[in-house]
Amino acid sequence: MNISEIENFIIEKLKPNFSNLLVQGFPEKPQEFTLLHPVGAILVHYRGGNYSTTDALGFISQDKKMDFALTIVTRNLRSNNGAYEVLDKIKQVLCGFKIVGCSKLTPVKEGFLSEISGIWQYEITFTLTAPSVEDLEEGGINAG
């Protein structure tokens, strides 16, 4: 399971639960993103990962802990469809969500990002673990 596939599974899980918001991957040029949606947006992106240690002398197999961040962009803080409500609902929808080949999504951090001209931005980060396995090719070079 690669990063893009996991990101897409998260987006597809959110869409039916947030039909009143724009749900998509984080923009390629975030500095150019303008909230045009009348209510708000949820923007999903891969934040990074860490690999477990290995003492393997032969075949390498590790766990990769991956963090995915969801940026919530809303026009309200507390009222209907405000940042607080969206944060709570995202946690409810994604906590325990299992993507095939990965561990369940677990929330690890959330917080305030910014407020500019009444547009509120918060972020919630989820983590999961996926296997990272050496790609064995026949006839590979043996440096041994």
Model regions and ranges:
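Oligomerization/assembly interface segments of phage tail-like spikes and tubes
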Residues: 60-76, 120-132
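Residue-level signal for secondary-structure boundary sites
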Residues: 52, 76-78, 132-136
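Small/polar-rich, solvent-exposed N-terminal microdomains that initiate assembly or binding
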Residues: 1-58, 80, 85, 140-144
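Residue-level marker of positions within ordered structural domains that often coincide
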Residues: 19, 49, 75, 95, ...
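Extracellular/virion structural assembly segments
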Residues: 59-65, 73-95
